[in-house]
Structures are given as C-alpha cells and as structure tokens.
Design a protein with these regions (language model features):
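Bacterial N-terminal signal peptides
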Residues: 1-6
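Sec/Tat signal peptide C-region and signal peptidase I cleavage site
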Residues: 7-13
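N-terminal module-boundary/linker segments of secreted carbohydrate-active enzymes
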Residues: 13-45
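A general structural motif
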Residues: 19-21, 49, 104, 139-140
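Residue-level detector of flexible, active-site-proximal loop/helix-junction positions
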Residues: 31, 57-59, 149, 193
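Conserved SGNH/GDSL esterase-like catalytic core that processes O-acyl groups on lipids
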Residues: 33-126
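Alpha-helical cap/lid subdomain in secreted, periplasmic
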Residues: 91-223
Length: 223
C-alpha cells in the first residue's frame, strides 16, 4: 500500500483529497526546488491533493537562511508554487512573509550540499531557524530534507580528501544528528539517490530534475 510516509502524522489520506490539499513549504536550495515539479504528478496518481511551495536560493545554507530572516526587508528568495498540478506565478520573497502567508501543514528545511557533511555547520543557525518556524507557525510539522553527495569526479571531493561514499555517510550522520535534536523526521532523498546510483552499471550524476525525480520516490514509499 502506498502512503505519504514522509508526512506521516500530519493528516490522514482522507484529509489529503483534492478539496483539502496538503500544504508543504520548502525552505531550501537547488536540492529542493525541483520537487515543485516532481511531486505533483505523484500526488495526482495517488489521488491526493498537494499544494507545494519552494523558496530557495542556490547554495543557501542554514546560516544564510537565518541571516535572511534577520534582514526581513530583503526578498532574496525565488518562490515557486504548484497547487494540485497548476503552477502559480513565481515571485521574489522572504521567509517571514511566505511562512505566514498560509497555514502550512509541513515545512521542510535543509543544509547547503557543500556543508551537509560537516555537522558543525548546522547549529546554531539551524536551531534558530527551527525556533523561528515554531514561533511563527506552531501547528506545522517540520521535516528535514536530506541532500545527496556529489559525483565521484567533483573536484570538491578531492579538495576535501573524501570520496562520494564518505560524503554520503557523513551527511547522513549530520542530518540524523540534527533531526534527533528536535525529534524531526527526515525525508531521505540523499539515501534514495545513493541507492539508485549503486544499482546502475555506470556512474550517475544526479543533476537538476533527474536527482529530484529519484529523490521524490522517498516522499512516497511502500509499507
């Protein structure tokens, strides 16, 4: 049986029908933005209503998200939204205004990919972000949206003296430790991408939409 495992506890399947779509806000970077196009077809196939919104800056870290909250007069985010498969007009915005514009059921957060494997980069900024979301939207369920490791030939891996598997191992541990501090569930898109890579006869680069299509499978899984 198919279920919205990543959103477990938010609402029942019956409550997710199209007349009452699940409202999801993603505060992230380029590793989350394509979910706006990848997830609606999946939700449609399951006859589930989905209102999904992404606010992102490429390469945006938890620290930068927090610093942007501290400068609310700026609108540095590209905001895209899709309501039951219908795309809304994109606009520039900031976290305070978008977070309070709707009664979001779910808010996802993630670390920048280049910092994701370094656990010391998550706090205090991630904790500040969590506290702010809870204060502004106490009814929302916060989920940690995992990113994935780089391709084996990415120069940054050699600069860091680690390989793809080591980056994946460390980012999983860092995300897990961060989520456990607050009792959050993780959307394990990075793990899904890594498992997919291992099944391929060639090395796989999870670029743009490709990686997110693979990752979106982890929003919905079999019981």
């Amino acid at each position: 049986m198919l279920c919205l495992s990543a959103f477990a506890g938010v609402a029942s399947v019956a409550e997710q029908k199209r007349q009452n779509p699940l409202k999801v806000l993603m505060i992230g970077n380029s590793f989350s933005v394509q979910m706006v196009t990848a997830m609606p077809p999946v939700a449609k196939d399951l006859d589930l209503g989905l209102d999904i919104c992404s606010m992102y800056i490429a390469g945006c870290s938890l620290r930068r998200h927090w610093e942007n909250i501290c400068a609310p007069t700026t609108t540095p985010y590209n905001v895209t939204r899709c309501i039951d498969g219908i795309a809304a007009k994109a606009f520039s915005g900031n976290i305070p205004e978008v977070l309070t514009s709707e009664k979001w059921d779910v808010v996802t957060i993630q670390q920048a990919s280049y910092l994701s494997w370094r656990d010391e980069t998550y706090n205090p900024w991630g904790g500040n972000l969590v506290k702010y979301i809870r204060e502004m939207l106490p009814s929302a369920k916060i989920l940690v949206h995992e990113t994935w490791s780089y391709t084996p030939w990415d120069k940054r891996l050699s600069d860091w003296k680690i390989d793809q598997d080591e980056m994946h191992k460390r980012l999983c541990l860092a995300y897990s430790d961060f989520a456990k501090q607050y009792g959050f569930d993780i959307i394990p898109t990075g793990t899904a991408v890594q498992l997919f890579r291992k099944r391929l006869p060639v090395k796989y680069a999870a670029n743009s939409l490709g990686g997110d299509v693979v990752g979106s499978a982890r929003f919905i899984e079999k019981d």
